[in-house]
Amino acid sequence: MYQRMLRCGAELGSPGGGGGGAGGRLALLWIVPLTLSGLLGVAWGASSLGAHHIHHFHGSSKHHSVPIAIYRSPASLRGGHAGTTYIFSKGGGQITYKWPPNDRPSTRADRLAIGFSTVQKEAVLVRVDSSSGLGDYLELHIHQGKIGVKFNVGTDDIAIEESNAIINDGKYHVVRFTRSGGNATLQVDSWPVIERYPAGNNDNERLAIARQRIPYRLGRVVDEWLLDKGRQLTIFNSQATIIIGGKEQGQPFQGQLSGLYYNGLKVLNMAAENDANIAIVGNVRLVGEVPSSMTTESTATAMQSEMSTSIMETTTTLATSTARRGNSPTKEPVSQTTDDILVASAECPSDDEDIDPCEPSSGGLANPTRAGGREPYPGSAEVIRESSSTTGMVVGIVAAAALCILILLYAMYKYRNRDEGSYHVDESRNYISNSAQSNGAVVKEKQPSSAKSANKNKKNKDKEYYV
């Protein structure tokens, strides 16, 4: 298209196309708008691209109240009810998930992630138990205001705790736990990952430790049993129940729990969907899909009022409405955390920089912000949407091309009519000149003037000059 337009401009600029100066001016008439329109289209596309950048800056502070590590979550975990939140009020409550008897898993590795806010110093958040008689379990708890995990997969109780982070401050926190055999890792928010490697780094060494606890007099029968048991010392056998809330353990949790993920199960989402394998008892109330991350003042007020349902509900509603309206001049920014952050962190616990540019089902990752400041948290994602920018650029280029074609057609039409008029005028002049040459009378009238000039030349020749 552009080559054809250039050829048309060259023809108009040639001597046979309407004059060199006029053709040059005509070329400028459509080249300049073409350039300007193209730049406009590119600028439009660039502005669309810039409008869809979400910049989250990286910081270095460790003391904060929301998660910073955002990992790539599997595609199967990005739908559904993201960030389902339950409030456990005064008196405690409990959400229990039971595996069907014929579908109880035995796992060598486990992954657990959950968001919460509370002011309690002692509570049990989540506990997973094996079938009756096996004794395997995994428990996430708060002890003296510190978060920790305790589990047993066939030998002794193994404990791991984050002793540096205070989590009973009423702020929103995220905890991630992974287990592989007897080894475990624990991370709270953006604090460094804590690793726990118990004595006996392989099955044989751990089997030897277990054998020492069995009386020797039991003999060969026990040895054979230990050999079989040794292959299971790293396996969480026949998991039967997931208990959320700690009421059954005598340490009921009071506060908010959000987005629980355990080995592919999003239990709180299932509870909100009235799953047949889930039972809810006690003072437990569903809040909504967006976990409310409350400020220190609002959460402390709610907790000091004995976790009143009405106060907690009002605070949560206020936080949710504030998040929808955006940052208010008089309110602190409200952070939001979706299940994508929790679930993905459990799926990829060793990769802190694997950030997903794709969008969650609800329209983008949340922007974690500090509860008492304006600065975003480190490790956040930069999400770029290029579809709108591409559309804007294409529309701009098409508009520029259409405008240039219209200008070129109008200019060609105008100069074509002007050239035809000039041709008629030149033809009439040639006709008058030819008629004058063919008219004998007119020629005769001009003959006396020619005779006079001849006589004058003769007189000049007759003159004599003297020096």
UniProtKB/Swiss-Prot annotation:
Belongs to the neurexin family. It is a single-pass type I membrane protein. The lineage of its organism: Eukaryota, Metazoa, Chordata, Craniata, Vertebrata. GO terms for biological process: angiogenesis; cell adhesion. It is found in: Presynaptic cell membrane. This is Neurexin-1-beta. Residues 46-391 are extracellular. Disulfide bonds: none annotated. The cytoplasmic C-terminal region binds to CASK. Binds NLGN1, NLGN2 and NLGN3, DAG1 (alpha-dystroglycan) and alpha-latrotoxin. Binding to neuroligins is calcium-dependent, and the binding preference ranks as follow: NLGN1 > NLGN4 >> NLGN3 > NLGN2. Interacts with CBLN2 and more weakly with CBLN4. Interacts with CBLN1; interaction is CBLN1 hexamer form-dependent; CBLN1-binding is calcium-independent; isoform 1b does not interact with CBLN1. Interacts with CLSTN3. Residues 413-467 are cytoplasmic. PANTHER family: NEUREXIN-1, PIKACHURIN-LIKE PROTEIN. O-glycosylated; contains heparan sulfate. Heparan sulfate attachment is required for synapse development by mediating interactions with neuroligins. Neuronal cell surface protein involved in cell recognition and cell adhesion by forming intracellular junctions through binding to neuroligins. Plays a role in formation of synaptic junctions. Functions as part of a trans-synaptic complex by binding to cerebellins and postsynaptic GRID1. This interaction helps regulate the activity of NMDA and AMPA receptors at hippocampal synapses without affecting synapse formation. NRXN1B-CBLN2-GRID1 complex transduce presynaptic signals into postsynaptic NMDAR response. Keywords: Angiogenesis, Calcium, Cell adhesion, Cell membrane, Cell projection, Glycoprotein, Heparan sulfate, Membrane, Metal-binding, Phosphoprotein, Proteoglycan, Repeat, Signal, Synapse, Transmembrane, Transmembrane helix. Residues 86-284 form the Laminin G-like domain. Residues 200-229 are annotated as: Essential for interaction with CBLN1. SMART domains: 4.1m (SM00294), LamG (SM00282). It comes from Bos taurus (Bovine). The keyword Transcription does not apply. Ca(2+) binds at residues 136, 153, 235, 237. Residues 1-45 form the signal peptide. PROSITE patterns: LAM_G_DOMAIN. Pfam families: Laminin_G_2, Syndecan. The keyword Phosphoprotein applies. Glycans are attached at residues 183, 345. Residues 324-339 have a biased composition (Polar residues). The gene is NRXN1. GO terms for molecular function: metal ion binding. The chain crosses the membrane at residues 392-412.
